[in-house]
């Protein structure tokens, strides 16, 4: 941060540790898990992307057999591409009257309470940005489910098996490595007859017949049948009402969608210039600054402010490497 900013809003290491520290429901947040993080030295730059078609047989249509003394066949090629990125600044603050700090009868520091409160706002907003990107009908290939997964006649395993083939073919023969569900769709899987009828073992024991499966058992079934290693459930909820209005909560990750695609394997290399080289993936997380926190007093010394701030960007990279399935829950 610039020195002038630090003088006005000094970073407090204790409060920074508090905003990073997890609260009990933070395990529902998946934004930091689903993307490959790319730590960049500058807020903006260029990512240079390899063209995967260059490795799909750029010599197609050529006769590679060479007669003695003749020239070798020259294969074709596809230009590599580039995109620009710019990490954005995200920040939030809250304040408390000095008198309330002095008069507080609650256990613990009021500043620490504000730090946790502000951090939760920041983390939920980050989760929302991730969900808005990966569940966006316009950022990736999209199709509608043949039936909602909570329908009695639905066959979600068969649907997901076919979706994997669709992603595989669109990605030039690369298998999807990530599957993300909204919680409603995922919970419907545990009650679905096709999934409940699956016979197999999992970490918690043996599952078969008409037993309703635990979340861990459903994930194990999906990994076993689909061969997709990274499976996540977006279960976080957020109050969507403005301050002063009646509380209205909703899921951050839409309950009637899922994402399947390639979010691993960028093998990104960050150059001194700030540019990034890598293989294409569906989306990346460009991280310029980790979340930090601090506190400062108003000029008239009547209020104390606590803030949190981070600099990052979730960015779609290749629309063909991800697929959004809609209509998965009624």
Predicted regions and their residues:
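Protruding loop/beta-arch "assembly-hinge" segments enriched in small, turn-prone residues
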Residues: 1-34, 290-330
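Intrinsically disordered, low-complexity linear regions
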Residues: 2-29, 49-50, 141-142, 148-163, ...
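Assembly/oligomerization interface modules of large self-assembling protein complexes
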Residues: 25-93
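Alpha-helical scaffold segments that mediate packing/assembly in large oligomeric complexes
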Residues: 98-205, 330
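Short, surface-exposed loop/turn segments at secondary-structure junctions
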Residues: 104-108, 259, 286
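A general structural signal for short secondary-structure junctions and capping/turn motifs
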Residues: 169-173, 178, 222-223, 250, ...
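Extended oligomerization regions of viral-like shell subunits
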Residues: 174-280
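C-terminal structured domain segments
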Residues: 264-307
